[in-house]
Structures are given as C-alpha cells and as structure tokens.
C-alpha cells in the first residue's frame, strides 16, 4: 500500500496567506510535549524557475511552513535556517530547517513589566501570549481556549529589566511544583479547512484520546530503545534565585532555598547525590522553594523515556497521538516474562518512506 504523499506549504507567518507549494524530498519531522519540535525538508532546484520560486517564497524568520500528509496537517512551524548545497554533478538543493511554533516565543521578550496576583496559571500563559501578540508585528495567530483552567493560582511578576524570553518563563511556570504541560499544536479545522495554531494546555499533564492503541513486539514495534540513566539522579537539592541585594555598593549574593534532602533514600543505602538549579529571575522565596521541590521530585526517581520505532503501515499513528495512552507488550530475552504496561506518548518523530525505506514513527514514552 502506498503511503500518502507529503507536501510543504509555505505561508506568510502573520497572515497565513499561501506563498507557494514547493516540491520537496527527504522530509523529516518531530513534535513533543515539553520541547519544541523540529522539521526539515530539501527543495530540489533542477531549474531556474524552481530556484526563483524558492527564493521568493522562503524568507527565513518571516515564512510559516506547514507539512501535510495526504489531506491532513501533521506539522507546523517557522523555518529559521537553510543550507544551499551543490554536489559534484552540480545538482542544487535547498535544505530547510524549521522549529515548531513555540520557537517563535524564543524570539519574543518581555519588554514591559507583567504582573499577575492570584491568577490561574493557564491565564498567566494566555496573558503572556496576549502581551506578545499585542505589540506591533507580534501576532502570528496562536489560538486558545479562554475558558480552560488548571485550578492552581499563582503570583508572578516578570520585570522588563530582566528581559526574559516568553518561552523561557512559560517553561519555568510549567515546571514548578503543581505545574502543567503545554504545546502549540497544528491541525486543519474539519469544517472550514482553515490551518490552526492551537495552544494546548494540561494540568498536571496533557492527555488526549479516548481509546488506547496496543503495540506489540514482535509486531508493529520494529525496534526499541530503553535508556537507563543515573547521571541526572539526585537526593539532595538546592536552588538559587535572583540577588536579594538592592545596594549596588555591597556584595551581591543570590537568594538560596533551604537544603532539601530525601532522607528515606539515604536511609535505604543510597549514596548522597547533590543537585542544584538556577532561577536567576525568581525573586520570591516561595516561588523558588516550589521550583526546588519540583526539581528534587524529578531527580529522586528520574523516569526513563522509552523509544519505540513503529511501522506506520501496520498501525495508524499521527502527531495527534501526543498525550494519548498506548499499551506496550514486549516479549524477548530481556523481558522474558513479558512486558505489558501503559505509557503516555510525549514525543513523536516521523520518517517518511525513502528509497525503499518504510514509513516509520519513533514514539517517546513515559509511564502513564
């Protein structure tokens, strides 16, 4: 069975007006929860006409790129870099690298102090997006559900003197104790056919899908990786915040949390493993303490992120699977008694078919 064709639609970032649909090859894409997705594609340049079209349509930092698989949108983002290549035969190609919509927020700073007191953390995120969009040239059409709430209120002040990047402070807000997950999804509205950039929020995590998919090895799972990593483990933690000194003539020292210790793990015989983190823009002791507690909780028993490579002609998968639950069943020499567990999909990388290579998806999982 033939896989649906991939195509790249280039649009104006601010208006989403289509600029061109160029022929592409060697497409790859990935998307994640908690991390900016990436995509790349090569535009073959066999003649002057195609080269002129590519030059006119692709203006890095100003152009939006949508990747379609058949009738569906599978990825959206912004091309930030490109590489023009010529081989020994003089064959030209333009390799485009793009970051997901959230990468735009790496290029937006808080230049006017923003303050929230007793505000739901989802509203703080939406307020930051509204602030970003309110400035001239800053609206790229990110949509959201204004009624969605997390039930957790926060006090936050983002000072213009710190010039923090918008994505950085959203990530900090998400990763604090009692935080949330967020991403900006891409899809086509089923009614109007309009391309959508949608803010997706979930507290404490993003969950999607009503029915789980079963993946077996041997079976649709072609291969897997199961990383085991103790380098990020810690049972003692301390975090540093902003300086609490307002006197420029005196020595400036950062605010510090109390030393957090997992006594139960040390009593169980574990060696002491120290961990630290820096939050140089955090000025409130309670906020810094919440960051430290969240960091220790993640480091005491770090979760492995298994990776499964799945044949897409054996099981229907798409980027809409992010946040969904899958049931993984593996039987081999390591899992001699058989593994049968449920996991949540937190990342997905697609490799389209290429020169006899089947179309595959690599799933990144965490315990459900």
Task: Locate predicted features.
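Charged- and aromatic-enriched interaction segments used to assemble
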Residues: 99-229
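Beta-strand-rich assembly/attachment modules of structural machines
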Residues: 1-122
């Amino acid at each position: 069975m033939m896989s649906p064709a991939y195509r790249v639609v280039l649009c104006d970032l601010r208006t989403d007006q289509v600029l061109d649909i160029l022929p592409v090859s060697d497409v790859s894409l990935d998307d994640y929860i908690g991390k900016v997705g990436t995509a790349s594609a090569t535009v073959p340049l066999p003649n002057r006409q195609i080269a002129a079209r590519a030059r006119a349509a692709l203006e890095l930092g100003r152009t939006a790129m949508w990747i379609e698989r058949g009738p569906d949108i599978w990825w959206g983002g912004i091309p930030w870099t490109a590489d023009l290549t010529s081989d020994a035969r003089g064959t030209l190609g333009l390799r485009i690298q793009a970051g997901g919509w959230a990468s735009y927020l790496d290029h937006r700073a808080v230049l006017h102090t923003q303050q929230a007191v007793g505000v739901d953390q989802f509203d703080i995120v939406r307020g930051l997006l509204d602030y970003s969009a309110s400035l001239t040239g800053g609206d790229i059409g990110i949509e959201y559900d204004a009624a969605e709430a997390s039930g957790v209120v926060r006090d936050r002040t983002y000072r213009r003197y710190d010039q923090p990047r918008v994505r950085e402070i959203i990530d900090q807000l998400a990763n604090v104790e009692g935080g949330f997950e967020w991403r900006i999804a891409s899809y086509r509205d089923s009614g109007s056919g309009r391309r959508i950039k949608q803010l997706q929020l979930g507290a404490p995590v993003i969950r999607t899908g009503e029915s789980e998919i079963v993946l077996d090895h041997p079976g649709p799972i072609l291969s897997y990786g199961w990383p085991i990593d103790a380098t990020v483990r810690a049972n003692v933690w301390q975090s540093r915040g902003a300086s609490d000194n307002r006197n420029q003539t005196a020595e400036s020292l950062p605010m510090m949390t109390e030393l957090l210790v997992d006594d139960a793990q040390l009593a169980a015989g574990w060696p002491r493993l120290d961990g630290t983190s820096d939050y140089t823009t955090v000025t409130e002791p309670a906020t810094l303490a919440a960051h430290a507690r969240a960091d220790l909780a993640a480091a005491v028993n770090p979760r492995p992120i298994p990776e499964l490579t799945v044949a897409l002609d054996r099981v229907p998968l798409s980027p809409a699977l992010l946040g969904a639950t899958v049931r993984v069943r593996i039987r081999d020499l390591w899992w001699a008694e058989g593994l049968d567990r449920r996991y949540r999909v937190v990342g997905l990388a697609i490799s389209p078919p290429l020169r006899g290579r089947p179309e595959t998806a690599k799933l990144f999982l965490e315990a459900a």
